[in-house]
């Protein structure tokens, strides 16, 4: 496993931007759970969206690959609720992809950006998810 190649003695932070959309949910779950076991105290940060958004993003790719079941691909609506159930080692937090990091009350923010933010973060549940890997299982803490 590539895990053994990483010296995590000083901690480990992983970023997977725009990656998990192309994997099946069981594949993402297996990877996340294995990472939580291999890198206690580490972190994984990635972007996620709901099924509607994933379907739109993957529309061309799915058609070319002749894949019919977009529901099998990784998508998240409520990261804390859905992903916390994967492992006792996961501490899950998330913020809106656009609204979570920008103050839209600022007058310098254009109306079009506000509109995109509301569609992306609202209707499509686009979010940045942070998983903190516990040093021990919740049951033993």
Give the residues covered by each predicted segment.
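Alpha-helical subdomain
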Residues: 1-141
